[in-house]
From Swiss-Prot:
The keyword Protein biosynthesis applies. One of its GO terms (molecular function) is translation release factor activity, codon specific. InterPro entries: PCRF, Pep_chain_release_fac_I, Pep_chain_release_fac_I_sf, Prokaryotic/Mito_RF, RF-1. Methylated by PrmC. Methylation increases the termination efficiency of RF1. The modification N5-methylglutamine is found at Q237. Coiled coil: none annotated. Keywords: Cytoplasm, Methylation, Protein biosynthesis. One of its GO terms (cellular component) is cytoplasm. It is found in: Cytoplasm. This is Peptide chain release factor 1. Residues 283-307 are annotated as: Disordered. Peptide chain release factor 1 directs the termination of translation in response to the peptide chain termination codons UAG and UAA. It holds the Pfam family RF-1.
Amino acid sequence: MNSSILAKLEQLSIRLEEVSIMLSDPEVVSNVKKFTKLSIEYAQLTPVNQQFQTYLSHLKNLEDAQLILFEDDMEIKTMAKEEILNTKKILSQLDLKLKKSILPKDPNDSRNIIIEIRAGTGGDEASIFSGDLFKIYSRYSEKQKWTIEIISSSIGEHGGFKEIIARISGINVYSKLKFESGAHRVQRVPTTESQGRIHTSACTVAIMPEVENIEEINININDVRIDTFRASGAGGQHVNKTDSAVRITHLPTGTVVECQDGRSQHKNKAQAMSVLASRILDAQQQEQQEQQSSTRKELIGSGDRSQRIRTYNYPQGRITDHRINLTLYKLTEIMEGNLSAIIKPLIIEQQTNQLTELNNT
């Protein structure tokens, strides 16, 4: 382990002591918000520090065993050699764990998300595929015990969605689904195809961290135009006689959000504002990502939603993630919501690249 990493771990140990002292301060205890924040930090730092202290202890044992090699007693030297081998194995394992523990954390990982799926090239087949993608995320969310709520949707003429926007809430949603942003391509024979020809269609997926408190995004009310209109069902059929649907336009950016799936104008307005805030936050963070490491841009995308990230090939039962050249012949399983087979390799790839960068510092 290089000196810069050791220095970072020593700083974490010092910080843990500081937090421990602050948590016993009566003023901090009486401040619920500050006490909660520090308690979470303490809980995060404690296991890292415990591993670090264990690492230092084994490092001292290794140094002691290496000194014994200079002894004349062959039996003691043999025991020392065995001790050195075992200790090096333990240190190697602890080294990797500690490095992973200090990798840069994405501040959005614990957030809920706003997911937007839009049909792209391919007409009706693209709309049907967008519906299939929504089913994948719905089933995966169910397996993760997350909650999914549709905010807005536009039904395709032959099924699926021209566009669907939803909120997914639960534990660490963004950390697992953030890799889904980009263009998803499907190759299959449409049900309407009489010649049995394979068609290629595409959809775009946008994953945005949800803004828990809209006030954290500075939206000037004078920069927002709010219009109301009657909500419509499939085929343009009015589903109510009041102007419950809401369209919000953010004038500086030209961002437009519509919401009509809620039962009231108040709920639709709140949901539309939530989506707007998430889009603005996402745009700000996409800008920041341009200045970050190539690893992050490569895996999560540089903001270009048209970047093709994945192909679903039905005739071959194959799914390919182009970012890490991963090909799996588990299409049916993944379409049933078993996304972990793709998400885990993406996380491992990101961590591997981060570890490489860390080792080079």
